[in-house]
């Protein structure tokens, strides 16, 4: 991948705003804060902002920056780990002078002035690792590397996803060479709290299993909030179903109410082998071939999507 255009845009900009997707995971925030830190460490005087409204509670992260409309309008916006513009966690990114998209999702909805896409990468953090490593004249600090390693580790599920390649492992090696405490980082991002442990028990005891191969659970708002979780955190527990050998397709759905009080469903969908992102796309969602998401499903949508997922086992 030719990173020269991205580097040149960063060099020329006085103000840079960095965005990522809604319901952020460690790859989204890891790539965001890694890029911010790398720019700040190498380009003194630039104004760099990490934008977004939502947070993830998987590991500890810096706070997002509070940014005015005027700042965004005078910036270049770099949008990370976001397949389509509807999923950017702050619609004001569109006000920027220029928009650069850096992503590892299939580019089914290109947006922005510049798109740097590598959909064979296991994580956007993998892409940025090679970007930073390409230009060895710049500082690539351990702090930047740790942000990236968190995202790489979680999006590849500890190097177990089917899009983990030798390039993914090479990226991990580059990051490890900065002196990271790999064991500590792994525990930080994967270990459960007591609440998380109890919530895992809830998921296991309430999972529906069809044909001994398709597993799903629907978690209502009252339940996940009682464990101190938001909806995004609750859906991130979808990985707990991956350890069952017989489950080839699995999903976690959370409920919410719209303005009229109607129940809607958001879901995290996973498959060990067969493609499912085309199913997500039928309902306005998307993602990777074997890891996708959907939002704002009606009860009728739920019936349909469960039937379609069941057919992919």
Feature annotation, model-predicted:
Residues 1-5, 80-81, 132-134:
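Short, motif-level signal for alpha-helix interfacial/capping segments enriched in acidic residues
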Residues 19, 23, 79, 101-102, ...:
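Generic enzyme active-site microenvironment
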Residues 35-36, 94-97, 117-118, 170:
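Glycine-rich, phosphate-binding/catalytic loops in enzymes
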Residues 68, 89-91, 115-117, 138-139, ...:
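A generic local secondary-structure boundary/capping motif
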